[in-house]
Amino acid sequence: MNSEKIIEVIIAIFLPPVAVFMKCGATTPLWINLVLCIFIWFPAILHALYVVLKD
């Protein structure tokens, strides 16, 4: 893991939609994460971590 990936993980924990936006832009994963973030915070964190770490 390089330093860029570590920063992305930290952002994914504290600001999940921002991390997904940085990784994917304004695409479907961002909207999924925003809905998760509005309703339940913890699944939004898991989804953001998945998006950030899947590559």
Curated annotation (Swiss-Prot):
Question: What's the protein name?
Answer: Plasma membrane proteolipid 3 homolog
- Membrane disposition: Multi-pass membrane protein
Q: Please name the Pfam families in this protein's record.
A: Pmp3
Q: List the source organism.
A: Candida albicans
Where along the sequence do coiled-coil regions lie? none
Which key words are in the record?
A: Membrane, Transmembrane, Transmembrane helix
> Looking at the UniProt record for this protein, which Gene Ontology cellular component terms does it annotate, in alphabetical order?
plasma membrane
Q: What does this protein do?
A: Plays a role in the regulation of membrane potential.
State where it is primarily located.
membrane
- Enumerate the PROSITE patterns for this protein: UPF0057
Gene (name only): PMP3
One of the GO BP terms on file = filamentous growth of a unicellular organism
Report the sequence similarity comment from the record.
Belongs to the UPF0057 (PMP3) family.
**Location within or outside the cell:** Membrane
- The residues that cross the membrane are 3-23, 31-51
